[in-house]
Amino acid sequence: FYKNTVSTYYYSDLSVKYLNLAKENGYKADDIPEYLGLSYAALEMPMESISAFSEALLIRESDTLLFSIAEQYYKAKQNSASKQYLHRVIQNNQDDELVQKSRILLGNIYLEEKDFENAEKEFNNVLLINKNSADAHYGVGVIYEQQGNIAKARAEWRSALKIQVNHPGALKKLSDK
């Protein structure tokens, strides 16, 4: 395998090739579908990734697997399916980090759907767990922006930048306004 500047798959394409070859030749391992899902995700092939992750879900259900499926549905623009998986992760999980990621993704979905009330609820739930969440501050800022309150929006984006100095969304918003 040769990797140049045009190809930046970092061997994920080879992983897919050889994992599928192993399955075709009868090799059985419980983790093959999960690794296939991760490889397809790295190759930005969400539907194939969802298929592989769903197969892995039948073998062993885990919260990180449910979150990975939700992420891929989000990338495939299937927000209703993504929301269902995110709600399962939030309800059944004790890992604060994964719950935060799930709530932030759910908040972003609500933002896209222009459901600002639920988006704000999700971002505020993240801030209750972790007041130093740059993504949650950024999301609240976007809500304020959509509501026409630019001063509060900019304050939230500055808070995001204090926490994470290179937050891409906050940097872009503050440079645009």
Where are these regions (language model features)?
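Register position in tetratricopeptide repeats
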Residues: 4, 8, 42, 75-76, ...
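Terminal, low-structured helical/coil segments at or just beyond the last alpha-helical repeat
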Residues: 146, 150-177
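Alpha-helical adaptor scaffolds
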Residues: 68-80, 84-128
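Conserved structural position within tetratricopeptide repeats
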Residues: 17-24, 54-58, 87-94, 124-128, ...
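Helix-start (N-cap) detector for alpha-helical repeat units in TPR-like alpha-solenoids
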Residues: 29-31, 63-64, 96-100, 134-135, ...
